[in-house]
UniProtKB/Swiss-Prot annotation:
Top-rank taxon: Eukaryota
Subunit-level organization: Interacts with FTSJ1; the interaction is direct, and required for 2'-O-methylation of position 34 in substrate tRNAs. Interacts with IRS4. Interacts with STK11/LKB1.
GO BP annotations listed: G1 to G0 transition; negative regulation of autophagy; negative regulation of cell population proliferation; wobble position ribose methylation
Function of the molecule: Together with methyltransferase FTSJ1, methylates the 2'-O-ribose of nucleotides at position 34 of the tRNA anticodon loop of substrate tRNAs. Required for the correct positioning of the substrate tRNA for methylation. Required to suppress amino acid starvation-induced autophagy. Enhances the STK11/LKB1-induced cell growth suppression activity.
GO molecular function annotations of the record: enzyme regulator activity; tRNA binding
Compartment(s) where it occurs, according to its Swiss-Prot or TrEMBL record: Cytoplasm
Modification type N-acetylmethionine: residues: M1
Protein name per Swiss-Prot or TrEMBL: tRNA (34-2'-O)-methyltransferase regulator WDR6
Species name: Mus musculus (Mouse)
Length: 1125
């Protein structure tokens, strides 16, 4: 298939690549990063702007960049110009650049040198370049002339897994080669007697029991570090490697990684290693782990670089992320865990509870009823009071706020509550609230205006106490405001509380896992039909007289809104209000985002904490606008950042079942707990956050399986969409309106990510991610795309409903709203609300007669989704589209979405294909004076296509849907309207397009690399042709049919008909190919090689006449192409 000269249009060009970062190097205050064949340059001058300066596209052609080597300058000045050798795979190129603080200019570039072997290392030798190749040979190359000067092999021509070149001249050049035999071979290329004469190894070093992946030599100390497949790092004393015959001694064997170690770097005082476990470890030269950097996701950290002067470590991962970390001695160090030495003969009794009043005062109570204070500035214990009534059972809680407002509360097993001013404990005020045990205490603070203390007693009664201070500040007043009543449950007490801004409602969580909304002032809350009943204190179960005498206090106010068992049976651990939303955490390893609308609680999104954190204890908002999650992972207390996916603090405390407390301010964070009868304290200066910088956000930790464009947001010039390029280097006309494409991706890492892709910047911003799936996400579908304010609203923004599906027969529906926000780097804010979900095994478990049915395979996977929007006036089904799913168990299933996606119901299914269904696609047929018809096409692993008439099937009274064999099961779809045997094996891509003649073009791509294109005609019989009362069923037939057997060299995973005359296809052979249609068999026009391996999905869309079309390719990374009409 030769290209016709007249049809070179369109030509696709790459504008964005998100691939694993495989090369990093610090040059002065700049960072060079290799992503695929592209070179990224960052400015690391923290006094200026920390951002990308330049992206040099396609520098190494089709090779991936694995490293950079900068030519040493005689004066050591690399601040203005640098000569850089860029290498990777089998390619090498030398580039001379001139750079400043905010620009980079390419002065000269050599040709691409294609080697016949893999390049493991490159070193500058007196203006030339020495290259270590994959079969143990060294080549000397002149980059200016572009010719090879020397080619010296070793006598041992084994395959290498790594290499390191040492020396500044050809005479002293030394190569340390890591052979696949797990040995280090040290030899000297200059000792060859004649050209191309093999050189025998000078030394062989063994010790590792796996392949050696990386090595680093520190000349000043004569040390060599090696990283291996055996998950260890070894340190060798080698002396001066340039001198033959030296002794090699193993002086360190470091085990700390849980998987293979990819990279190692030796510094004067540290050893840095990174591996497949996504952890970067900092070691001392004695083999002690000093720091551990965790944050990357996926299959490992592929590249590391260091900046010794600034004490920085830079890591690049498989998730396309680049992070900068501070070595010990920089930033805000942790002070570690220390014992506060409570045990003393002068302090009798055993500790019962501990809490924090601010970050520098610790309160503790003993089993003899004594309350003690420890001041971190004074560093001594002080007894505040002793009360024998609190000796057998005592609860202790300090008021929230920076310094606890100087208040704490005690409660005992006889219904007594005492509020104690910490500075003046003699002014304590007590009230007897109940006749029985006080189960829990919690504080609720509204700014500096209102402070409430909630105490749970018998029978689910919560006493709400209002705390106020005298004008002199030396006395406090405690007044019972009201009483609330919890819903019935076995363990009927509240666990946490918070004010809901502006302060009309109080949010509480209970031990049963429910979240409830109570009115703060019940006397002012008048809601007709609410059903809340107010009773007096004398009527309340277990109620007794308080300090107010026999005054009747209204009590028993029930919640105005309840989310029952939101966190399961283990209980709610915290509730927090921030940014107009309510966040709740629980011991079900998750946290919920909620909001209140019309006095009712509504869940927005459920998020999972880090793996292993089953007890989520709370969350905190940090100054940069993000949040951190507090929780327990086995016997460790963990502070985890959802934004950076990093465990910021880890304290081995023994678990969350002991008494503990946490407090944080901008100056410091503190965590105290009881262990072995002592009060232990962990403090870290600088608050919860750690001083690391995310140069670029990671995308997904595993392969991207699906990509779908949602829509476009247009931002005006007032939002100033940031550009990666310097303004001087922008092309004319590219400074137009800020068009930003919103794209969603699904991945094997079980997450769905919402991306913003500006058309003018060549960048990508991860707006948010959804983590509701328990297995991989395989398919996405979008419907109901609109604007936040409706069709009449001209303000920028985007709303859409998204359906995601994948492994474990799980499907989720959620809504996405994107609005302008000038405070974010992307200038956009994204809000996601989870609407509904469905799992086949859960659906089966709910059936009454399930013992009579065959259970659905829980390992069923949804392979593809299609939205089928029927007519709104159809009877019987109500408003909402259908979602068609291709299933691995051989079924085509139809789900009905109702109530704007809040109800997801399995309606019908068919096992017509009897094998794995790979693709589904829906399209509509419209003809003059005829009813709009909705047709579904499904494709299976045998290469067959089936077409279903959904309009007829969904009509009321239609006989197309067969009744199920048992009540509660879905309907049966019957037989399809037409089948076509398009391929000899599985169909991985499918698309249709209506033609001007009223027909439909159907294109499919197969696993054998073939394409199949045919024209489908839909004909409706005349009413007089129908037999009696028979339904008018459309007749489908194929008019023209063409096949291209060898369109690609591998699976065709994406096909899109752009117009009746143009089609584009993508394959695992990494070629994006354009085909000419309309003149018989599809004709090859041109092809572009892309850099994403194992492409699984493709989506194309028109942007505008000025920006043409865009195409997103998803696989082991993401790449965006564009072409112009």
């Amino acid at each position: 298939m030769d290209a016709f000269g007249d049809y070179v249009w369109p030509r696709a060009t790459s504008e964005l690549i998100l691939l694993p970062v495989t090369g990093l190097e610090c040059v002065g205050d700049r960072l060079l990063a290799g992503e695929g064949p592209d070179l990224l340059v960052y400015n690391l001058d923290l006094g200026g702007h920390l951002r990308m300066v330049k992206r040099v596209q396609n520098l190494l052609g089709h090779f991936l960049i694995h490293g950079f080597r900068v030519r040493p300058e005689p004066k050591g000045d690399l601040d203005s110009e640098a000569m850089i050798a860029v290498f990777g795979s089998k390619g090498l190129k030398v580039v001379k650049v001139s750079w400043g603080q905010s620009h980079l200019r390419e002065l000269w570039r050599s040709g691409l040198w294609n080697m016949s072997d893999w390049i493991w290392d490159v070193r500058w030798i007196e203006g030339n370049v020495a290259v270590a190749l994959g079969h143990n040979s060294v080549v000397l190359y002149d980059p200016v002339i572009g010719c090879m000067l020397q080619d010296v092999p070793c006598t041992d021509r084994c395959t290498l897994s790594s290499a390191c070149l040492v020396g500044d001249t050809w005479k002293e050049l030394t190569i340390v080669a890591g052979a696949v035999s797990n040995e280090l071979l040290i030899w000297y290329p200059a000792t060859a007697l004649t050209d191309n004469k093999p050189v025998a190894p000078d030394r062989r070093v063994s010790g590792h029991v796996g392949v050696i992946f990386s090595m680093s030599y520190l000349e000043s100390k004569g040390l060599l570090a090696t990283a291996s497949e055996d998950r260890s790092v070894r340190l060798w004393k080698v002396g001066d490697l340039r001198v033959p015959g030296g002794r090699v001694q193993n002086i360190g064997h470091c085990f700390g990684h849980s998987a293979r170690v990819w990279q190692v770097k030796l510094l004067e005082n540290y050893l840095i290693s990174a591996g497949e476990d996504c952890v970067c470890l900092v070691w001392s030269h004695e083999g002690e782990i000093l720091q551990a950097f965790r944050g990357h996701r996926g299959r490992g950290i592929r590249a590391i670089a260091t900046h010794e002067r600034q004490a920085w470590v830079v890591t690049g991962g498989d998730d396309s992320g680049i992070r900068l970390w501070h070595l010990a001695g920089r930033g805000y160090p942790g002070l570690g865990v220390s014992s506060l030495s409570f045990k003393s003969p002068s302090r009798p009794g055993a500790l019962k509870a501990v809490t924090l009043a601010g970050s520098w005062r610790v309160l503790a109570v003993t089993d003899v009823g004594s309350l003690y204070l420890y001041d971190l500035e004074v560093k001594s214990w002080e007894q505040l009071l002793e009360d024998n009534r609190f000796r057998s059972y005592c609860l202790l809680e300090a008021a929230p706020g920076p310094e606890g407002f100087g208040l704490c509360a005690l409660a005992n097993g006889e219904g007594l509550v005492k509020v104690v001013p910490i500075n003046t404990p003699t002014a304590a005020v007590e009230q007897k609230l109940f006749q029985g045990k006080v189960h829990s205490l919690s504080w609720a603070l509204r700014g500096y205006e209102e402070l409430l203390l909630l105490a749970s007693g018998p029978g689910g009664v919560i006493a709400c106490l209002e705390i106020s201070a005298a004008p002199t500040g030396k006395a406090i007043f405690v007044k019972e405001r009201c009483r609330y009543l919890l819903p019935p449950s076995k363990q009927r007490w509240h666990t946490c509380s918070a004010f809901l801004p502006p302060g009309d409602f109080l949010v509480c969580g209970d031990r049963r896992g429910s979240v409830m909304l109570f009115p703060v002032r019940p006397c002012l809350f008048k809601k007709p039909g609410a059903g809340s009943k107010a009773i007096t204190a004398a009527e309340a179960p277990g109620a007794g007289s308080g300090s107010g005498g026999s005054e009747s206090v209204p009590t028993g106010i029930g919640p105005v809104s309840t989310l029952h068992s939101l966190h399961g049976k283990q209980g709610v651990t915290s509730v927090t209000c921030h940014g107009g939303y309510l966040y709740s955490t629980g011991r079900d390893s998750s946290y919920f985002q909620l909001f209140v609308h019309g006095g009712h609680l509504q869940p927005v999104l459920r998020q999972k904490a880090c793996r292993g954190m089953n007890w989520v204890a709370g969350l905190r908002m940090v100054p940069d606008g993000s949040m951190v999650i507090l929780g327990f992972h086995a016997n460790e207390f963990v502070v985890w950042s959802p934004r950076s996916h990093e465990k910021l603090h880890i304290v081995n405390c023994g678990g969350g079942h002991r008494s503990w407390a946490f407090s944080d301010t901008e100056a410091a964070m503190a965590f105290t707990y009881l262990k072995d009868g002592e009060v232990m304290l962990y403090r870290a200066l600088g608050g919860c956050i750690r001083p690391n910088v995310i140069l670029r956000e990671g995308l997904h930790g595993r392969e991207i399986t699906c990509v779908k464009r949602v829509g476009t947001v247009t931002l005006g010039p007032e939002f100033e969409v940031p550009n990666l390029e310097h303004p001087d280097s922008l092309e004319p006309g590219s400074e137009g309106p800020g068009l930003i494409d919103i794209v969603i991706t699904g991945s094997e890492d079980t997450t769905v990510c919402v991306l913003a892709l500006p058309t003018t910047t060549g960048s990508a911003h991860a707006l948010t991610s959804v983590c509701n799936h328990i297995s991989s996400v395989r398919a996405l579908a979008v419907w109901a795309v609109g604007t936040p304010g409706g069709p009449q609203d001209t303000r920028p923004g985007l709303t859409a409903q998204v359906v995601s599906a994948g492994g474990r027969a799980e499907i989720h529906c959620f809504s996405v709203m994107v609005t302008p926000d000038a405070s974010t780097p992307s200038r956009l804010a994204c809000h996601v609300m989870h609407l509904s979900s469905h799992r086949l095994d859960e659906y089966w478990d709910r059936q009454r007669n399930k013992h009579k049915m065959i259970k659905v395979d829980p390992e069923t996977r949804y392979m593809s989704l299609a939205i089928c929007e029927l007519d709104n006036d159809r009877p019987g089904l109500g408003p909402g589209p259908l979602v068609a799913a291709a299933c691995s168990d051989g079924a085509v299933r139809l789900f009905l979405l109702q109530d704007s996606g809040r109800i997801l119901h399995l309606l019908a299914e068919s096992f017509h294909h009897k094998r794995c269904v790979l693709k589904v696609h829906s399209f509509t047929h419209e003809a003059p004076n005829q009813r709009r018809r909705l047709i579904l096409c499904s494709a299976a692993t045998d290469g067959s296509l089936a077409f279903w008439d959904l309009t007829t099937a969904m009509d009321k009274g239609s006989t197309t849907l067969e009744l199920p064999a048992h009540p509660g099961l879905p309907y049966q779809m019957g037989t399809p309207s037409m089948t076509v045997q398009a391929h000899s094996c599985g169909v991985n891509s499918l698309h249709t397009l209506p033609t001007p003649e009223g027909h439909h073009l159907v294109a499919s791509g197969s696993e054998d690399g073939s394409l199949h294109v045919f024209t489908l005609a839909v004909k409706m019989p005349e009413p007089e042709e129908a037999d009696g009362e028979a339904e008018l069923v459309p007749q489908l037939c194929v008019l023209e049919e063409y096949s291209v057997p060898c369109a690609h060299a591998a699976h065709v995973t994406g096909v899109k008909i752009l117009s009746p005359k143009l089609m584009v296809s993508a394959s695992i052979d990494q070629r994006l190919t354009f085909w000419r249609l309309g003149q018989g068999e599809p004709t090859f026009m041109n092809s572009t090689v892309y850099h994403v391996p194992d492409v699984a999905d493709m989506d194309c869309w028109p942007v505008s006449p000025e920006f043409g079309h865009r195409c997103a390719l998803a696989g082991q990374g993401l790449e965006v192409y564009n072409w112009y009409d």
